[in-house]
């Protein structure tokens, strides 16, 4: 399993027992007693309260406290270097344009995002989208890039990321780094 949420869980709790299930089945399986707890992702981060579930750990807060305020890296867009510099820059440019459009046209962007909202109401959709489509989506900023590198380094130390990957050599296209 190679997701940033899973890696955050392992960094926070070490070697814990896990079962892999589709993300939209996590809350129902906790509610029906199949599992004692679950790693809640996507809109479940907002909707778990509707089910009277207790938070054991908020990984974002945990990472923020651990790093002195850095944001927890969740997801991200990557481009293979073998595609060449121009392709990397073009993909970055068009992705950035898409995000900027969403920020300038929130009503249209939110309507588009509803397709993937899995039944959430408009207000929850707005809150969820604003968590992941914001100024930091366009530019991680210096502390965001440092956070990504630290997260990868800790994942390597824990054995979740191959040791020959050089996070210091990682490029953030368009960041003027």
Region roles according to the model:
Residues 1-46, 146-150:
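Bilobed "Venus flytrap"/periplasmic-binding protein-like clamshell domains
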Residues 84-154:
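Secondary-structure end/capping motifs
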Residues 65-73, 148-159:
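Short secondary-structure transition/capping segments
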Residues 22-115:
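Pocket-lining segment of extracytoplasmic ligand-binding domains
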Residues 154-177:
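Conserved C-terminal helix/tail region of periplasmic/extracytoplasmic solute-binding proteins
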């Amino acid at each position: 399993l190679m997701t940033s949420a899973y890696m955050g869980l392992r960094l926070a709790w070490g070697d814990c027992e896990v079962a892999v299930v589709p993300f939209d089945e996590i809350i129902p399986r906790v509610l029906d007693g199949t599992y004692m707890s679950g790693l809640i992702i996507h809109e479940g981060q907002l909707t778990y309260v509707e089910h009277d579930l207790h938070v054991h750990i908020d990984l974002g807060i945990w990472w923020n406290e651990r790093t002195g305020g850095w944001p927890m890296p969740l997801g991200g867009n990557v481009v293979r270097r073998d595609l060449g510099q121009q392709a990397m820059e073009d993909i970055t440019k068009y992705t950035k344009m898409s995000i900027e459009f969403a920020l300038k046209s929130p009503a249209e962007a939110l309507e588009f995002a509803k397709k993937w909202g899995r039944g959430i109401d408009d207000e929850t959709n707005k809150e969820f989208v604003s968590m992941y489509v914001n100024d930091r989506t366009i530019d991680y900023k210096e502390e965001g890039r440092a956070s990504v590198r630290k997260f990868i380094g800790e994942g390597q130390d824990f054995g979740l990321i191959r040791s020959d990957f050089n996070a210091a050599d990682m490029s953030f296209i368009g960041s003027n780094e």
